[in-house]
């Protein structure tokens, strides 16, 4: 099992993430440095923060190519070495204790499931929980939810490497929504699920996604929804919702999420 973490000029966030990979977690860790210039990856310091049962590996891209390229380079490395499972984590986000073992157990008990996610606790930069976003759990619930948005927290997923033989890797034509596109393809070829438990802490940085970046993400989402539309009422409603969000400020959207999802979920 390989835990894939892309990195770009955020060593402190990386160290927080590596600190959360507990000594009892059965995984190797691959950090892909996406051409960091201001804060190049310090392998020795990273290794000091990684206490996993397995090994820490690093892969450096010669230049900054974007998260899709970094993730796909990591997936190529992982597939070449024959890993059966891939889990994701992003710099700054932190595993809850037992996250890796819990998802491995789930996939072993459900051989028809190709992708499994879980809930995330949204925390501020001080680590204080703001809210937990509930997600659909079953395959049918997820297929319905995909009409509106991704049904998975990207840094909280684990999937079978072999599913990539059918879906391909992260697409590059949907910037900032590459995960939404890939996970929809996975849901078409196999069963998918979310464990109804909080598996990670997701760092909510108001400056991490610029206004232009958020617009790009929503525009990509709209393209994915249109590509997968079956003309149903649910599909049309999902497209309309995304178009409304294109005119909604980011902070307002976060406040609505926190109102609808109080901080009480396990």
Where does each model-flagged region fall?
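Conserved donor NDP-sugar-binding/catalytic core segment of glycosyltransferases
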Residues: 98-130
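Short, well-formed alpha-helical segments that are part of the catalytic scaffolds
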Residues: 10-23, 42
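Catalytic beta-strand/loop signature of glycosyltransferases that borders the donor
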Residues: 119, 180, 193-199
């Amino acid at each position: 099992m390989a835990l894939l973490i892309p990195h770009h000029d955020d060593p402190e966030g990386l160290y927080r993430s590596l600190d959360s990979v507990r000594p009892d977690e059965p995984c190797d860790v691959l950090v892909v440095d996406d051409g960091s210039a201001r804060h190049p990856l310090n392998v020795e310091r990273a290794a000091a923060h990684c206490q996993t049962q397995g090994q820490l590996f690093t892969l450096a891209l010669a230049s900054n190519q974007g998260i899709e390229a970094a993730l796909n380079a990591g997936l190529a490395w992982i597939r070449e070495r024959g890993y059966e499972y891939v889990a994701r984590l992003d710099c700054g986000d932190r595993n809850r204790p037992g996250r890796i073992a819990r998802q491995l157990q789930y996939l072993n008990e459900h051989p028809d499931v190709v992708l499994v996610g879980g809930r995330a606790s949204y925390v501020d930069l001080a680590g204080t929980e703001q809210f937990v976003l509930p997600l659909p759990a079953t395959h049918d619930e997820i297929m319905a939810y995909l009409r509106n948005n991704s049904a998975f927290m990207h840094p909280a997923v684990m999937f079978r490497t072999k599913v990539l033989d059918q879906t391909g890797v992260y697409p590059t034509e949907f910037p900032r929504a590459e995960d939404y596109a890939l996970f929809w393809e996975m849901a078409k070829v196999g069963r998918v699920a979310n464990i109804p438990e909080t598996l990670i802490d997701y760092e909510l940085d108001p400056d991490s996604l610029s206004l232009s970046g958020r617009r790009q993400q929503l525009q990509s989402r709209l393209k994915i929804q249109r590509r997968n539309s079956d003309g149903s009422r649910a599909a049309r409603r999902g497209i309309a919702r995304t178009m409304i969000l294109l005119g909604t400020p980011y902070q307002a959207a976060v406040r609505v999420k926190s109102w609808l999802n109080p901080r009480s979920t396990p």
